[in-house]
Regions:
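Terminal substrate-recognition subdomain of acyl/acetyltransferases
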Residues: 1-74, 179-246
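Acyl-donor binding region in acyl/amide transferases
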Residues: 18-25, 29-31, 117-118, 129-132, ...
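Generic alpha-helical secondary structure signal
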Residues: 61, 99, 164-167, 172, ...
């Protein structure tokens, strides 16, 4: 393992904070250990891995609970060895427009790195393709992107698709967790709804949904970096022996 820090900016006069993105390089034999310590592969800057408030689900809990009920009108199809993105381009454009994102974002970027290690979950409503989800399977399963047309918001397709992904990955019997990238701001509170929820607080995986939601709310309310919360996640009596030694 090699750790890289980018000391981009900070303040130490009237307040005290530093903005320091953290990246790392890992040997293949370290991949699983890296994921278990809050690192995920960087899709756009390989071979770097990045540290963040990652969210994941314990797949064993998905098998132990009653299967999520999905409306009969909704169907899913797993696509491996994807040959073309043409079927998803209109959905992608509509998704960017509805979300208010830069419409110049290219869908191709999601497949530039390790396309053979990714699958697409196609989502159909009454046999019409209306959404898709891109999942990286190796070295760990990561749900990278969900996009849909918002043709019927009441359907909550994103929730149903997430349950489908969890149940599908759990059924394979080869993975212990499913990752859904970092959880920041109000828009990511929904990630705490699912069984087996955990988030990385920088020291360990926590199942505290209330704390996670509070942190997301703080993210969205923050305007000035000087207003950063004084909350300290490390209690005075924290047992540092629990931290993994490399």
């Amino acid at each position: 393992m090699k750790i890289l820090f980018q000391h981009l900016c900070g303040r130490i006069t009237r307040t005290d904070w530093q903005y320091t993105p953290v990246y790392a390089l890992f040997e293949k034999s370290e991949f699983e250990k890296a994921a278990n310590n809050g690192w995920l592969p960087h899709e756009y800057d390989p071979p770097l891995w990045f540290q963040a408030r990652q969210v994941r689900y314990r797949l064993a809990e998905c098998l132990q609970r009653k299967k999520h009920k999905i409306p009969k009108r909704i169907d899913f199809q797993i696509i491996e060895n994807l040959k073309s993105l043409k079927a998803y381009e209109e959905i992608w454009k509509e998704y960017l427009k509805k979300k208010g994102f830069d419409e110049d974002q290219s869908l191709d970027r999601l497949f530039e790195l390790d396309p053979e290690k990714k699958i697409v979950v196609e989502v159909y409503d009454y046999d019409e393709l209306v959404a898709f989800s891109v999942i990286r399977l190796e070295p760990i399963p990561v749900s990278l992107q969900f996009a849909w047309t918002y043709h019927n918001p009441k359907l909550s397709l994103g929730i149903h698709c997430q349950y489908f992904e969890l149940e599908y990955l759990a059924s394979l019997g080869v993975y212990t967790h499913s990752y859904v990238c970092p959880g920041y701001e109000n828009t990511c509170i929904w990630k705490s709804r699912f069984p087996g929820f955990e988030f990385w607080n920088g020291m360990e995986w926590s199942s505290d949904r209330n704390l996670y939601e509070r942190l997301c709310l703080i993210d969205s309310s923050l305007v000035d970096p000087d207003d950063l919360s004084n909350d300290d996640l490390i209690p005075i009596n924290y047992d540092f022996s629990k931290i993994t030694s490399w």
